[in-house]
């Protein structure tokens, strides 16, 4: 790699990179990937600035060669590549002369035309992930961020790319060339995998002072010091009689171990109450898409352009009216909000050039729906600590809800195949070792089974919505930005397709902490009549907005089209996890892999091919009241994926608690089935811990009902 860097980059860049690494005590000969990354970043910064000038009139111009005497000023000041002291001197001088706010971290460039500092990023990972790491690190709205990737993708603050198309294409081509050159020398894989996120310095510290005293005070009885306790724990032998061990640990414990027999466990008690309601951030089986095939319109790929194009494919719009009101909401406001979206989309079309983003007018209906000015005023603690009856708000206990059949239908639907493919196979380099060949084979088989699965559509929809919402929350904090809900797929014939599910309008989003909430209103198309299962749609106001002609076996039929509108909220940390929903594919692939491994170790050879290609064999999928359900290996893949996706879509404290506590009971039952004669103490306490998580969450209630089916069949 070191030789490659010295051949591939200009000697001046190599020298600057070496200097920078030495300044931080790093050796270019050892940390060769870092050496290459620094050179690449420097080169991109220089290319960004090259040929860009400001003429006498203050206009930005591009001059590749010409009159050396022309009165031209460089458009960009290059800060990257200077030693730290000099770089800060330049930054301070710019701030003093222009009045621009001083950044906390050294930026890479200053743009005299845009009057802003620019942070350039070059990433081997996904641009949006790297963009967010940068944004989180510099935490400044004033510094403009522009990220390039080696795959030709880019991302910039507010989608403002500063440079013209051609200059950016030069940079992308150069990055692509570097990647090709590395790949041809077998260096790319190691370089790609070596990228870490933005690093923060963490201090290591010994436990001293107050913390040490607290540690000593909180030891169990009969221990004099922390070291003494540590030595005991390290030497604790975990085998032998449980009662003896417990009494050895503490005099207060006297646990009677009860044998756990087939007749011991009882079913979990599910709550009574009204049926549970839908609480996902977007519609699942009830969603309706307006789609365009082979999109090639101007601005294709810009969400707003795509959305308008999709909206134009539907001709059955009609005067909207409320068909299922929201019990607690002001329903006319939801109606007005939809009308406002239609009107503002119409306004955009009447403009000469469609903007890349659309901020909605702050009307009274949107202010109400987005909870503007509804947060209680924050008061400094110093001003109110003397108030005698200062107390926290009383919050109501959540109302218990019973299991409703719709959540099982949602799950069944998520396991089904659609007629489109939602994921592409990543380009991964040639397999080198035999183990890589097996891994690629497993991945390809697995991808073939799940690429058309509806759960995979939910993953891509979730990734898109969360990325777009987090982006808008950072880039347009005060604006009510209109965000189309879009996904992309390929048809059976391999044609590209862009789908619009509806729109989100984001509220104010000054998100300082990970858990700070941004409110949004979602408006989603559907053909589902909400009056069939009104309990499912408790949190929604549903409008009828049009009539759609559908082709059926008996010819064309007209069906009413509905719009499901609700106020919702999310946080930075939830959006971050939402953006990483692709991990669900990995989790379910690993579960399948452990099944293949078990089979392979019995047969003492790799069973991947037989596992996926033996269509006659069936596998256990899950429990139902009818008994153990079985299905093909593809069905197993899709069921595992759907479970993982629903764990992400319906993530909640109730699910965390239920999963952790019910697992303990599951292990005891498994031990009984394996004739290990398990014993338990305080089984009642375990049931209590499980059942306190069964309150109102549809996914948790469904899992509890599956668990009961499992208990019934496991203990026959």
Curated annotation (Swiss-Prot):
Its main location: host cell. Keywords: Cap snatching, Endonuclease, Eukaryotic host gene expression shutoff by virus, Eukaryotic host transcription shutoff by virus, Host cytoplasm, Host gene expression shutoff by virus, Host nucleus, Host-virus interaction, Hydrolase, Inhibition of host RNA polymerase II by virus, Manganese, Metal-binding, Nuclease, Phosphoprotein. Its EC number is 3.1.-.-. The keyword Metal-binding applies. GO terms for molecular function: endonuclease activity; metal ion binding; RNA binding. Binds 2 manganese ions per subunit. Influenza RNA polymerase is composed of three subunits: PB1, PB2 and PA. Interacts (via C-terminus) with PB1 (via N-terminus). This is Polymerase acidic protein. It comes from Influenza A virus (strain A/Turkey/Ontario/6118/1968 H8N4). The gene is PA.
């Amino acid at each position: 790699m070191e030789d490659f860097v010295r051949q591939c980059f200009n000697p001046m860049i190599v020298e600057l990179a070496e200097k920078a690494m030495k300044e931080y005590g790093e050796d270019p000969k050892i940390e060769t990937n870092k050496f290459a990354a620094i050179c690449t970043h420097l080169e991109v910064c220089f290319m960004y600035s090259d040929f860009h000038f400001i003429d006498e009139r203050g206009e930005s111009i591009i001059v590749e060669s010409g009159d050396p005497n022309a009165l031209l000023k460089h458009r960009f000041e290059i800060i990257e590549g200077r030693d730290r002291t000099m770089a800060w001197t330049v930054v301070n001088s710019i701030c003093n002369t222009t009045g621009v706010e001083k950044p906390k971290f050294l930026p890479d460039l200053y743009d005299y035309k845009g009057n802003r500092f620019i942070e350039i990023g070059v990433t081997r990972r996904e641009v949006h992930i790297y963009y967010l790491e940068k944004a989180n690190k510099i935490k400044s709205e004033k510094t403009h961020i522009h990220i390039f990737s080696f795959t030709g993708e880019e991302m910039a603050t507010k989608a403002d790319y500063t440079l013209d198309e051609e200059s950016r294409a030069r940079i992308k081509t150069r990055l692509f060339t570097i990647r090709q050159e590395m790949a041809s020398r077998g260096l790319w894989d190691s370089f790609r995998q070596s990228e870490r996120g933005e690093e923060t310095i963490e201090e290591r510290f010994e436990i001293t002072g107050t913390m040490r005293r607290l540690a000593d005070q909180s030891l169990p009885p009969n221990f004099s010091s922390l070291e003494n306790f540590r030595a005991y724990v390290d030497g604790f032998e975990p085998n032998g009689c449980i009662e003896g061990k417990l009494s050895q640990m503490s005099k207060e414990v006297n646990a009677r171990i009860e044998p756990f027999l087939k007749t011991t466990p009882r079913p979990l008690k599910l709550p009574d109450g009204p049926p549970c309601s839908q609480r996902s951030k977007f519609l699942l089986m009830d969603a309706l898409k307006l789609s365009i095939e082979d999109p090639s319109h101007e601005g294709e790929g810009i969400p707003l352009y795509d959305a308008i194009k999709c909206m134009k494919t539907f001709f059955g719009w009609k005067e909207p009216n409320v068909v299922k009101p929201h019990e607690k909401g002001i329903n006319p406001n939801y109606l007005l909000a939809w009308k406002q979206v239609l009107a503002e989309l119409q306004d955009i079309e009447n403009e000469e050039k469609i903007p890349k983003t659309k901020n909605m007018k702050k009307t009274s209906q949107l202010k109400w729906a987005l909870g503007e000015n509804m947060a209680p005023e924050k008061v400094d603690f110093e001003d109110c600590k003397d108030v005698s009856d200062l107390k926290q708000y009383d919050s109501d206990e959540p109302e218990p809800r019973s299991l409703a059949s719709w959540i099982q239908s949602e799950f069944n639907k998520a396991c089904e195949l659609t007629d489109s493919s939602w994921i592409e196979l990543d380009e991964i380099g040639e397999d080198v070792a035999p183990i890589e060949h097996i891994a690629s084979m497993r991945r390809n088989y697995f991808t073939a089974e799940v690429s058309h699965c509806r759960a995979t559509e939910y993953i891509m929809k979730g990734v898109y919505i969360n990325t777009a919402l987090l982006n808008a929350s950072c880039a347009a904090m005060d604006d009510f930005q209109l965000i189309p809900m879009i996904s992309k797929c390929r048809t059976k014939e391999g044609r590209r397709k862009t789908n619009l599910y509806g729109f989100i309008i984001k509220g104010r989003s000054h998100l300082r902490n990970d858990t700070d909430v941004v409110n949004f209103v979602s408006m989603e198309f559907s053909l589902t009549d909400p009056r069939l299962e009104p309990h499912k749609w408790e949190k929604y106001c549903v409008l009828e907005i049009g009539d759609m002609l559908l082709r059926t076996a008996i010819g064309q039929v007209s069906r009413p089209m509905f719009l499901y509108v609700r106020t919702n909220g999310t946080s930075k940390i939830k959006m971050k996890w939402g953006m990483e929903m692709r991990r669900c594919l990995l989790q379910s692939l690993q579960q399948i892999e452990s099944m293949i491994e078990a089979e392979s170790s019995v047969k003492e050879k790799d069973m991947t091919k037989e596992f996926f290609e033996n269509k006659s064999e069936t596998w256990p999928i899950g429990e139902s009241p009818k008994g153990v359900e079985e299905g093909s290996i593809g069905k197993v893949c899709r069921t595992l994926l759907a479970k993982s996706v629903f764990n992400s879509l319906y993530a909640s404290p109730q699910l965390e608690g239920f999963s952790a506590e019910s697992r303990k009971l599951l292990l005891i039952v498994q031990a009984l089935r394996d004739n290990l004669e398990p014993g338990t103490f305080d089984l009642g306490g375990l049931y209590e811990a499980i059942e306190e998580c069964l309150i109102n969450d549809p996914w948790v209630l469904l899992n509890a009902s599956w668990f009961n089916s499992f208990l019934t069949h496991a203990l026959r």
